[in-house]
């Protein structure tokens, strides 16, 4: 699927092998507001800041926890694939700052990873932030 955003509209196109064209198959994509999926590399839990640890702990507690809802973790190690799933089904993608390599805090590259995905997510009705500021407002 090819995803294109212009202005505030996000559209998905699928390649048609017969016509050799990309056909509009998912017009006006909007992120589902009520979803119980999150994407995070939980193997780095011990390196995260306490607020992220708390949020993931609460998600993992499910119905018995303070969020009173069962959540599913999805992580495939590809931001593009995770963002595609979020566009199709809703959810949250989390790539938190950690203290594993303090000199490299935040490993998503702003110009060709974070900004393009943030623009798509924001235009589809979602939010994209560092946890402290909107990604699209970073200079």
Where are these regions (language model features)?
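IMPase-like, lithium-sensitive Mg2+-dependent phosphomonoesterase catalytic core
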Residues: 1-139
């Amino acid at each position: 699927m090819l995803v294109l955003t212009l202005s505030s509209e996000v559209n998905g196109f699928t390649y048609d092998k017969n016509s050799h064209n990309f056909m509009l198959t998912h017009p006006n994509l909007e992120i589902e507001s009520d979803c119980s999926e999150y994407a995070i590399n939980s193997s780095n839990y011990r390196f995260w800041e306490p607020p992220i640890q708390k949020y993931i702990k609460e998600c993992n507690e499910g119905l018995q926890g303070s969020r009173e809802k069962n959540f599913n973790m999805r992580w495939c190690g590809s931001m593009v694939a995770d963002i595609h799933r979020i566009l199709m089904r809703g959810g949250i993608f989390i790539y938190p700052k950690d203290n594993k390599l303090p000199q490299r805090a935040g490993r998503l590259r702003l110009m060709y990873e974070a900004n393009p995905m943030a623009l798509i997510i924001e235009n589809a009705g979602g939010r994209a932030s560092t946890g402290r500021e909107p990604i699209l407002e970073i200079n």
